[in-house]
């Protein structure tokens, strides 16, 4: 299971870390020894998934980089050349003061004919500033993702009764340091980003534990922490 493997690869420092598997979709949650099943949990769209060593991944599926990927593809179709992700990030940074925001969980963003037009329409419908440039569209998406991560963590704290002190991001999306920094700022929690190949590493870890190369999951995670560059973004 890709998410299950990715969560295993999180080099968390303690049991107060939120896990975020960041890719086309964002899977945000924690590991628990027991499932959490009150009606409020279902209403907030959190789920319990069985995991390694009879743990439960308690998580929520949130929009991830799909909106950014869609904008990139659309711009490529318009110009004949797809902009790079660093170019899109730079455009957003130039529009960093733009305050557009949408609800990334809205079904309108799942498969629109034009993601750019849909973002603009959603801002207009919500009475928010309407982006006019690529940078403003990108900044709107970044504002929205970081806000929705922050809202999900607040829900998570309410449902678990725990206060979390950091966020560990794994997967391809962990390379987007601008989103990582905005997430740190929105949540007021430090963000630790990496490793990128969480799913492959988690799968390998389980096999190596079984083969006796690692004593247990804690030992394997300690090795991940020492073996890969983990970048930190402190809240501002």
Language-model region placement:
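Active-site core segments that coordinate phosphate-bearing ligands/cofactors
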Residues: 1-166, 175-199, 205-235
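Glycine-rich Rossmann-fold phosphate-binding loop(s) that bind the pyrophosphate
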Residues: 172
């Amino acid at each position: 299971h890709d998410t299950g493997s990715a969560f295993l690869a999180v080099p968390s420092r303690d049991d107060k870390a939120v896990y975020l598997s960041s890719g086309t979709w964002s899977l945000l949650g924690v590991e628990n020894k027991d499932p959490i099943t009150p009606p409020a949990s279902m209403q907030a769209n959190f789920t319990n998934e069985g995991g390694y060593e009879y743990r439960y991944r308690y998580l929520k599926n949130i929009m991830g980089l799909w909106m950014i990927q869609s904008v990139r593809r659309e711009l490529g179709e318009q110009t004949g050349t797809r902009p790079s992700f660093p170019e899109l990030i730079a455009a957003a940074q130039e529009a960093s003061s733009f305050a557009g925001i949408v609800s990334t969980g809205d079904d309108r963003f799942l498969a629109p004919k034009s993601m750019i037009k849909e973002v603009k329409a959603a801002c207009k419908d919500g009475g928010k500033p309407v982006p006019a440039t690529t940078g403003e569209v990108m900044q709107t998406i970044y504002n929205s993702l970081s806000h929705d991560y922050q809202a999900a963590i607040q829900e998570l704290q309410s449902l678990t009764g725990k206060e979390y002190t950091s966020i560990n991001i794994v997967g391809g999306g962990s390379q987007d340091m601008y989103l990582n920094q905005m997430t740190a700022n929105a949540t007021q929690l430090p963000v630790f980003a990496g490793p990128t190949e969480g799913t492959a590493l988690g799968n390998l870890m389980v096999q190596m534990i079984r083969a006796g190369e690692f004593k247990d999951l804690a030992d394997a995670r300690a090795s991940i922490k020492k073996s890969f560059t983990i970048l930190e973004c402190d809240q501002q």
